[in-house]
Amino acid sequence: MFYRISSIIAALLLSLSTFAASIETDRPWYLAGEAMKVSVTTDNALIAYAELCDTRTLAAGVVISLQGGKGTSTIELPSYLHSGYYVLSVYTRDNANVSRRLVAVVNPLHKSEDDDIEWVPVTDTDTQSYSATIDGESLSTADMADEKAVDVRETEGHIIKAHVKNVYNGTTYRANQIRPSVSIVGKQIHYFEGKMLNDTIAIFHTYGIHGKQPLVLSAATHTGVSLPIEMISPFASLLPKKLPRLVFHYKRNEVEARSLDMQRHQIAIAPASSEPQLGSYHDAEAEDGVPLDYDDTVFGAKPDLTYNLDEYRQFLTIGEVLTEYVNCVRRIKNNGVAQLTVRSVDESYVFTWPAMVLIDGMPVIDVDRLLNYDARRIHYINIYGNQYTFGNGVYRGILSFVTRSGRLTNYPTEPNVQYLVYEFPELNEK
């Protein structure tokens, strides 16, 4: 009890300690649609959050990984932003204090009723464009509409939260009946089983994941029901009560040149028509997918058995493959829920201890849907025969199906799960 009380006191002291972060941006002003590089320096943190807001809404944000108290990342400014000042706020999850600065954004291509800018031409040929304000450029806590809440400290990596609808089809499920998970879609296993903080809020402690990744959020009950789940924004959305008017001294040729560069940048970052999308591959695209070699530094173990289905194209469904080709997997029913069990060659079946079943990293809730899936779309079946623990879940083995694309090639969508592309913190080298 003493240890627990001491831990709580220590956490409170950390949350109340002084938070100081220096913020640097790579430019004194920005065009809507440009990339804004943000550099943060602070102490005692692994993850920092940078968000850009006007008085109405969150405009953009980024999660920054810190190495030695320093980190740099990029905020892609939407091309539709109105002209005016925005407030750039930087904070950590476990501290109520926030560092802020004003950022000038101009949009010469689109006028908006929200514009709060005075355009002043620069006549001196040696002077570059610059921003100014009559009201001053400092912001205090009193200028903000809301105070930042204090949350749990991120000690290992980025924390994700999600809301689970625990009342479904007339049945109410409690926290101990719900298994929330987040998984990265791809050819390697990045699976995180979460914890229910209460009956509706799930929390996930992720680590080792960086950059833009396709992921799947799911919440399954002990009876195999897939509950609706939705990610909670990682940003606090700290809105200012008011912002000063932007006085922008502009040099026409400089703004025009930057505008052309911005438009080229927007074309470069726009998703290509052939960019892989979850579950939307055509057959030809699926066949063209080049599988990545398994990386044992990711999961920590290589599969005990690997089946390459290039050698067995005669099977039409996964069920046929498991029956005729893979001898160490069996379908069982546990409390009316279909499950798959895995055994080693020299072991008997453990009928009541199911395996973790994944397809392209996504947990399979409906096993029968998987068994009816087109086996010709599967490239590898990887089988891990040991006991594995994910969060509060314990599994006897892992059965991992890898499609040729690694992007859930035409796999029937699991009901109520959330598919999205998420920006994890970029890896910053020391």
Residues covered by each model-derived region:
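Contiguous segments within soluble domain cores/interaction surfaces
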Residues: 21, 29-66
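Ligand-binding face of N-terminal immunoglobulin V-set domains in extracellular IgSF glycoproteins
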Residues: 39, 65, 70-78, 85-87
